[in-house]
Design a protein with these regions (language model features):
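Hydrophobic faces of well-ordered beta-strands that scaffold small-molecule active sites
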Residues: 1, 11-15, 40-44, 65-67, ...
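Conserved N-terminal beta1-alpha1 strand-loop-helix module at the mouth
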Residues: 1-42, 46-51, 59, 107
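Structural motif
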Residues: 8, 60, 111, 163-164
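Conserved anion-binding
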Residues: 49-145
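A C-terminal functional module that forms or caps the active site or interfaces directly
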Residues: 133-163, 168
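Short glycine-enriched loops at secondary-structure junctions
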Residues: 44-48, 70-71, 153-154
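Short beta->alpha linker loops
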Residues: 19, 23, 71-74, 100, ...
Length: 169
C-alpha cells in the first residue's frame, strides 16, 4: 500500500472501517510501519469487547481510534487500559451515530474522552441539515473537540463557518 505523494498532503492517515473489516487489524500495523511519523487513525468504531478489539487495533500503535457511542462505559475504560498497558497515548474518539444524548457526552468527558466525531449518515439523503449543524455547535460549546464526517462536499463548508470544528474527516 504505497500512498505516494498523497501522504505528504494529508494531516491524518485513516485505516477506515471498511478496510479494517476487509483486511483485519493488521492494516493498522502496516500503515504504521510504512508511515511511522504520520498521525494514524484506526476507525473500527469499537462497540464491545474493548480489551480484545481495542487491543488488536492498539498493537498497530495508532494515534487515534474510534469507539461507537452505543458502547458501555466499560468498553471505554477497557480500551484505555489496553493503551496504558502498551505505553501508548492513543486518543479515543467517540463516534456519534444514531442514538446518544448530551448526558452521555458529560459521562464520556468524566471518563477522559476529549474528542468526538459527529457522523452524518451516508444513508441519509442530502447533506448536513440545520439540526445537525446546531448539534455540532452545541457539542463544541461544551468544550470538547469535535470532528465532522460524512457527506461533506465543498459547497457544504459554508455551513460550518464560525463553528470550531477540530477537523473534517
Amino acid at each position: 500500500c504505497n500512498l505516494g505523494g498523497v501522504v505528504d498532503e494529508v494531516d491524518i492517515l485513516e485505516c477506515g472501517y471498511s478496510l479494517i473489516a476487509a483486511e483485519g487489524a493488521r492494516v493498522v500495523k502496516i500503515f504504521r510501519e510504512m508511515y511511522p511519523n504520520k498521525p494514524l487513525l484506526a476507525d473500527l468504531k469499537i462497540v464491545d469487547a474493548g480489551s480484545k478489539i481495542g487491543g488488536m487495533l492498539l498493537d498497530g500503535r495508532p494515534d487515534f481510534t474510534t469507539i461507537l457511542c452505543a458502547c458501555e462505559p466499560g468498553t471505554i475504560t477497557s480500551v484505555q487500559a489496553e493503551a496504558k498497558k502498551r505505553g501508548l497515548n492513543t486518543k479515543l474518539q467517540i463516534e456519534l451515530y444514531g442514538h446518544w444524548s448530551f448526558e452521555d457526552v458529560k459521562l464520556w468527558k468524566e471518563l477522559g474522552i476529549s474528542q468526538l466525531t459527529l457522523q452524518h449518515s451516508g444513508d441519509k439523503p442530502g447533506g448536513w441539515d440545520e439540526e445537525e449543524i446546531a448539534t455540532l455547535k452545541k457539542l463544541c460549546d461544551m468544550g470538547i473537540d469535535v470532528a465532522a464526517t460524512g457527506s461533506i462536499g465543498y459547497d457544504d463548508l459554508e455551513k460550518f463557518r464560525g463553528i470550531p470544528v477540530s477537523c473534517f474527516i
